[in-house]
């Protein structure tokens, strides 16, 4: 471990921490925590359950920010103490351990600085992510399932919870479509630029001649809207259909029509939910998803947004892709919007999406979802 490098890193990170403390305004955060705790102590606080839960989420968020700053400050103090000891009595192992602490601090500050770019109205919310197999037949359906695994791994690696709302299995392999909820702070902000067409090139495991196959899958991402947010949708604007939930066949097929699909006639938006046990629960879930889509359209106030967030049939094909995943004849994942790329395809498929997500946020990418989904 080079002492000069350690001192440089410590100085840089101390300055960055000071900037973070100024931006977050520690005295104001502490005052906010005190106000919220006093509010929560009121006898009638829980009379309105939804309002109380919202305030408790705000309190948890303030506490988390203060704890994060305290942890970062502790890391800097530990590094400074280590430096003083090292200059009195050099110990390479001690310095190496302190450098690891600074590396973790750098990662934390990098993440915080990135989250400052997530300033959209719904960036802090959870995400609803839908995957649709596109052109490519069975390979495309297999590709859709691979993407489901990739996003699930990414979410779990970031401490987020994944719940399947709807899943339609492929005839031979993979899935035709799937909708998942990703619950976690800034889930929508991180994932929103994943919207678009994802292209796979590989030797097809479903081709007896081992030919190279190109397959496509479409991704759409919506924020998970708070239940208290409501939109009045006239019943005449909705077309509700039901069907049986279940897999490819056998004793586990649901013989009751519990799956629900809702079409919003004026916009053509469609949502489907199959995972709940009752038709009523699936209808409530589908309505929540539809409202999220309509709310985003209303917030953007652009008719073109309808094409960006179209329903559950996605045309994912040549010329529309935002990212290529090449398994053969070479290995590379490349984002066509940011030029971010890596040769470690397996790591990406195991959920290592942060370099691509970070690049899209830092470069202010406008995800071309309309091209992918129209």
Curated annotation (Swiss-Prot):
It comes from the Bacteria. Coiled coil: none annotated. It is found in: Cytoplasm. Keywords: Cytoplasm, Methylation, Protein biosynthesis. InterPro entries: PCRF, Pep_chain_release_fac_I, Pep_chain_release_fac_I_sf, PrfB. Methylated by PrmC. Methylation increases the termination efficiency of RF2. Transmembrane segments: none annotated. The keyword Protease does not apply. GO terms for cellular component: cytoplasm. GO terms for molecular function: translation release factor activity, codon specific. Pfam families: PCRF, RF-1. The modification N5-methylglutamine is found at residue 251. Gene3D superfamilies: 3.30.160.20, 3.30.70.1660, Release factor. Peptide chain release factor 2 directs the termination of translation in response to the peptide chain termination codons UGA and UAA. Belongs to the prokaryotic/mitochondrial release factor family. This is Peptide chain release factor 2. It comes from Parasynechococcus marenigrum (strain WH8102). The gene is prfB.
């Amino acid at each position: 471990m080079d002492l000069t490098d350690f001192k440089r890193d410590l100085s840089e990170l101390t300055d960055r921490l000071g900037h973070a403390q100024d931006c977050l305004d520690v005295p104001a955060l502490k005052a906010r925590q005190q106000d919220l705790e006093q509010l929560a102590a009121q006898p009638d606080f829980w009379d309105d359950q939804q309002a109380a839960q919202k305030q408790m989420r705000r309190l948890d968020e303030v506490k988390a920010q203060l704890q994060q700053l305290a942890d970062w400050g502790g890391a800097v103090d530990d590094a400074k103490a280590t430096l003083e000891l090292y200059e009195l009595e050099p110990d390479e192992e001690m310095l190496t351990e302190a450098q690891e602490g600074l590396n973790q601090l750098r990662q934390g500050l990098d993440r915080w600085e990135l989250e400052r770019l997530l300033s959209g109205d719904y960036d802090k919310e959870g995400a609803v992510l839908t995957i649709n197999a596109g052109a490519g037949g069975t390979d495309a359906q297999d590709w859709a399932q691979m993407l489901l695994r990739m996003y699930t791994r990414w979410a779990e690696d970031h401490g987020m919870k994944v719940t399947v709302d709807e899943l339609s299995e492929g005839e031979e392999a993979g899935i035709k479509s799937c909708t998942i909820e990703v619950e976690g702070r800034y889930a929508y902000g991180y994932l929103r630029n994943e919207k678009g067409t994802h292209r796979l090139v590989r030797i097809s495991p479903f081709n007896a001649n081992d030919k190279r196959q190109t397959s496509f899958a479409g991704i759409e991402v919506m924020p998970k809207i708070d239940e208290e947010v409501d939109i009045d949708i006239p019943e005449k604007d909705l077309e509700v259909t039901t069907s049986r939930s279940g897999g490819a066949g056998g004793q586990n097929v649901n013989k009751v029509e519990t799956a629900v699909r809702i079409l919003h006639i004026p916009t053509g938006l469609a949502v489907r939910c199959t995972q709940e046990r009752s038709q009523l629960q699936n209808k409530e879930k589908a309505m929540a998803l539809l409202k999220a889509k309509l709310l985003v359209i209303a917030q953007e106030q652009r008719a073109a947004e309808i094409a960006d967030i179209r329903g559950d049939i996605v045309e994912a094909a040549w010329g529309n892709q935002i990212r290529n995943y090449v398994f053969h004849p070479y290995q590379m994942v490349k984002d066509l919007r940011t030029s971010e790329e890596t040769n470690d395809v397996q790591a990406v498929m195991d959920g290592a999406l942060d370099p691509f997500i970070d690049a899209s946020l830092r470069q202010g990418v406008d995800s071309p979802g309309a091209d992918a989904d129209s």
